[in-house]
Amino acid sequence: MSKFKGRALLLISGPGSESDVQVIRDSANTALEPFTLHVQDAQSICMGGRIILALDIECDPAHLSAIETDVRGAVEKFRCDVASEII
């Protein structure tokens, strides 16, 4: 049985190229380090000068707002937006 109480999607989107995806992913992962969670899956797409990075995480849903805030702070220097949704 998982110690996590829920799952959520974190979506990060903004301007960028394929070479920016890993840098943005690394920044997001650094922001996630203080939290007790597990990244189930990560997918990215780069199209038309934009990137979308999706992270499927297991976490405590009560912490999702703080997780989103910290990730937003980590990627705002790349002019990225962040959204989250409990699934």
Language-model regions: role of each:
Residues M1-I87:
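A conserved regulatory-domain signal marking ACT and ACT-like small-molecule sensing domains
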